[in-house]
């Protein structure tokens, strides 16, 4: 095809040369043919770049799914191999619904500092820490691993293990970094195979949302495989009927995060920050689940504790009273001129880095 294009362009040039000398026409044709062939080669190279980039994007889309299959390991390996084979120019062209150059190219920290905690032969007592997960290596090592390490230190007679509920994240980490993290089914199957008798499940979820419900459903199918199974409450405890209902868990969290935020900002207490015109906004993920009232309850808790300059917001904008626009209006109406923005999330991953820090 490129040769045919070159010949056609050369013929057109010869015809346009008109009644000039034969030598001139021949030189013109030769020169035009050379230019045309070069253009055709560039076009061919451009097509090859697009094909290679699209192939990589398609392979990323194939592993950007919430269900693990028998082909997942091979698909993760194929996606990474396709990425590694691309030139820098081709990598910038990787684009699809779920794929972009940052999927493999973004530096999120050193994965070797993390620990997937999927060893076998662990004894009869297992403490399974269940998290949504994050593909940000630094955040995963500092936040999720940090929690797991603390639980292991506090419970030396138990073996702490890990499970993520987001298969999309598990696949991302496996494809990019070669780190294999168990999903719920894998973790529970591993516990059974290891002869675990007593299983305690500690979620790192913030509330009784969809992820917590799905976790409980998965565990329910394995209850007869162990002598005892216990599931801990999420961080904010029980949900409660409406926005006015608060509990000790929410009070403890509200006090802890506000105290740390105030200290980090350089104030003696929240009142001193308020006097200086500073407000604190804690941003949660947000959810359409009925547990979304937990965010409103956290706002009620802050007010009950006297933290009038502390506001609760959500990235996803649910419930409506915690949407960014609503929180901004509250801060303005209260007259604060400075705002300290902090995540109300277990992990400072994608939302904290992109939606908050990148806003």
Task: Locate the predicted segments by residue.
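Bacterial Sec-dependent N-terminal signal peptides
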Residues: 1-6
């Amino acid at each position: 095809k490129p040769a045919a294009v070159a010949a056609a362009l050369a013929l057109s040039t010869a015809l346009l040369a008109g009644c000039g000398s034969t030598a001139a026409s021949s030189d013109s044709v030769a020169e035009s043919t050379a230019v045309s062939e070069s253009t055709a080669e560039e076009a061919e190279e451009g097509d090859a770049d697009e094909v290679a980039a699209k192939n990589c994007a398609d392979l990323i889309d194939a592993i950007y799914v919430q269900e693990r299959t028998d082909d997942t390991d091979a698909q993760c390996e194929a996606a990474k191999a396709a990425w590694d084979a691309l030139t820098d120019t081709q990598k910038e062209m990787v684009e699809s619904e779920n794929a972009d150059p940052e999927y493999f190219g973004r530096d999120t920290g050193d994965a070797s500092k993390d620990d997937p905690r999927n060893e076998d032969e662990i004894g009869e007592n297992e403490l399974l820490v269940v998290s949504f997960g994050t593909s940000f290596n630094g955040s995963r090592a500092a936040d999720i691993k940090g929690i797991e390490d603390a639980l292991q230190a506090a419970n030396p007679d138990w073996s702490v293990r890990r499970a993520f509920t987001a298969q999309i994240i598990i696949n991302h980490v496996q494809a990019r970094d070669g780190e294999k993290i168990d999903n719920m089914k894998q973790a529970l199957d591993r516990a059974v195979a290891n002869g675990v008798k007593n299983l305690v499940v500690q979620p790192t979820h913030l509330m009784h949302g969809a992820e917590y419900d799905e976790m409980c459903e998965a565990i329910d199918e394995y209850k007869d495989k162990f002598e005892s199974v216990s599931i801990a409450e999420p961080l904010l405890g029980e949900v409660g009927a409406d926005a006015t209902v608060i509990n000790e868990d929410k009070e403890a969290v509200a006090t802890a995060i506000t105290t740390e935020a105030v200290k980090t900002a350089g104030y003696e207490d929240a009142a001193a920050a308020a006097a200086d015109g500073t407000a604190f906004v804690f941003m949660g993920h947000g959810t359409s689940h009925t547990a979304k009232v937990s965010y409103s309850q956290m706002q009620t808790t802050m007010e009950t504790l006297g933290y009038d300059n502390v506001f609760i917001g959500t990235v996803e904008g649910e419930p409506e009273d915690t949407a960014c626009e609503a929180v901004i209006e509250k801060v303005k109406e209260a007259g604060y001129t400075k705002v300290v923005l902090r995540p109300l999330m277990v992990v400072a991953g994608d939302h904290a880095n992109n939606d908050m820090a990148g806003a």
